Amino acid sequence: MIDLVFDARRKDLGNFEVGRVLPFHAHRMVGPFTFLDHMGPAAFQPGFPKSADVRPHPHIGLSTLTYLFEGEITHRDSVGSLAVIKPHEVNWMTAGSGITHSERFEGLREHGGRMDGMQAWVALPTEFEEIDPSFTHHEGPAELPYYENGGLKARLIAGEAFGAKSSVPVYSPLFYVHWELEPGVTAALPAEYPERAAYIAAGRVEVDGRELVEAQMAVFAPGETVVFKALERSTVMLLGGEPVGPRFIEWNFVSSSKDRIEQAKADWKAGRMKLPDLDHGEFIPLPE
């Protein structure tokens, strides 16, 4: 039932840590998900330095999905969007042929507080890799279906699962779900998609007689229902879908074509990618 278990790799960004879950050397993608980061958890004091912010930077060939448990982030991008994301909301940014954006912790810098959340990259199918860039923000149960019963709280972040559909405009069959489980509660993930995984964002769960702990991802074999039992209060992120084929990933670029990534690198280095309208005073240079 469990094909593989691995730990998120912690990276210190100076003001807080990020756990890099995907890509993993032995399993680079789950369905169309090419990248998964756990941001925090971390506590910020008012007035922390702006160096913690993510300055403007580019993407191609993917959609980014930001989802928070705690805190807030201010998003600005090159299609003119300005959005403050708060817990249990979704920022969905489709890069397509190319977009730039920044993510800044302006509210936390002013008031202090905690940051804890997830960021995923979802590879676009080949026929959609060069679509026009776009951005949408989603919140509330009308857009992100919510279910609560007997110690389980479930929110469908994106895609389709458990008979529900999120309003996030995805481009291939996928699912992304946030579970909160009280101790002793069991919940099942059906065999609906060929590629499925679970990331334990907090707590401990048991699956198929094996204990999974905080900051671990388990990748599941296809064709079987997966039953989770919470050993303590736990936060579990479920994700997967239909594969879209292999992808090249370099810096912030994802593509089915290595040449396309080289072109994007050249465009960014030469200043040919438009910076966000509302945040164009600085940017992250291409790594050498």
Swiss-Prot record:
Stored CDD domains: cupin_pirin_C (cd02247), cupin_pirin_N (cd02909)
Family named by the database record: Belongs to the pirin family.
Residues in the signal sequence: none
Database matches in SUPFAM superfamilies: RmlC-like cupins (SSF51182)
Coiled coil residues, start to end: none
InterPro entries on file: Pirin (IPR012093), Pirin_C_dom (IPR008778), Pirin_N_dom (IPR003829), RmlC-like_jellyroll (IPR014710), RmlC_Cupin_sf (IPR011051)
Pfam family, one: Pirin
Protein name in the entry: Pirin-like protein CC_3178
